[in-house]
Amino acid sequence: MPGVVFDLDGTLVHSAPDIHAAVNKALAEEGGAPFTLAEITGFIGNGVPVLIQRVLAARGEAPDAHRQAELQGRFMAHYEADPATLTSVYPGAEAAIRHLRAEGWRIGLCTNKPVGASRQILSLFGLLELFDAIIGGDSLPQRKPDPAPLRATAAALNEEVVLYVGDSEVDAATAEAAGLRFALFTEGYRHAPVHELPHHGLFSHHDELQDLLRRLLA
C-alpha cells in the first residue's frame, strides 16, 4: 500500500492551549503581559523560532538573536515539561490512522514542531507506535513550507506517498512545492478562507478521511 503523511498541530491534535500556556509562563518570568489564546494560535504554523519571533514582534521588540534564543529556550523548557495537559486529539483522528494502518498504509508525520516534543505528545496519547516515520522542525536545516521535510518523510516511509494531510497555508504550500496532493482539515489553524488554499480534497472530521482517500485514489 502507498503512504500518507500527516501534519500534527491543528491536524491531529489541538495543541494551541499548551503552546499558549508555555509562552505566557516564559513571559511571566520576566513580568511580561500575557497573550490571549487567539493571539498565540495566530502565531502557530512555522515552527518554534518563528513563533517566538512573532511573540517578540507583537511586543514591539526589535529583532535580537540573543533575546530570541533566551526566550525560545525558556519557552521550550516550559513546553517540554508540560506539553499535553491542555492538548486534545481531534475526534476520530486516532481511529482514522488505525484504520489506515489496518489496511496496510504506511503513515508518516511531517511537522514544524521539534521532533522531541512531537514524539513526546504522540507517546502521551498512545499514538507514537502508529507512525513509521517522523520528521520535525529541527530534523533538517529546512522547515515547511520548504518541501525538503515532506520529501524526507516520504523517503523514510520507503513507499509512494500519495497524500499530505494538513490544516494550514503552510501545509498547502508544502504539499504543492513537493508535488503531492493535499487534503485540508478545515477545523485547524488556517488563517485564510478555504477557497484560497490549494487542495485536492477537504474534510471537517476525521471520520471522513477514508472516504476522501478513496475518492482521490479512484
Swiss-Prot record:
Any one of the GO CC terms: cytosol
Source superkingdom: Bacteria
Co-factor(s): Mg(2+)
The keyword Aminoacyl-tRNA synthetase appears for this protein: no
EC number: 3.1.3.18
Binding site for Mg(2+): 7, 9, 167
Protein's UniProt keywords contain Hydrolase: yes
Active-site residues, as the UniProt record annotates them: 7 (nucleophile)
One MF term in the entry's GO annotations: phosphoglycolate phosphatase activity
Enzyme class: hydrolase
GO biological process: DNA repair; glycolate biosynthetic process; reductive pentose-phosphate cycle
Listed pathway(s): Organic acid metabolism; glycolate biosynthesis; glycolate from 2-phosphoglycolate: step 1/1
Key words of the record: Calvin cycle, Carbohydrate metabolism, Hydrolase, Magnesium, Metal-binding, Photosynthesis
Family: Belongs to the HAD-like hydrolase superfamily. CbbY/CbbZ/Gph/YieH family.
Protein function: Specifically catalyzes the dephosphorylation of 2-phosphoglycolate. Is involved in the dissimilation of the intracellular 2-phosphoglycolate formed during the DNA repair of 3'-phosphoglycolate ends, a major class of DNA lesions induced by oxidative stress.
Protein name, as recorded: Phosphoglycolate phosphatase
Species the sequence originates in: Cereibacter sphaeroides (strain ATCC 17023 / DSM 158 / JCM 6121 / CCUG 31486 / LMG 2827 / NBRC 12203 / NCIMB 8253 / ATH 2.4.1.) (Rhodobacter sphaeroides)
GN (gene name): cbbZ
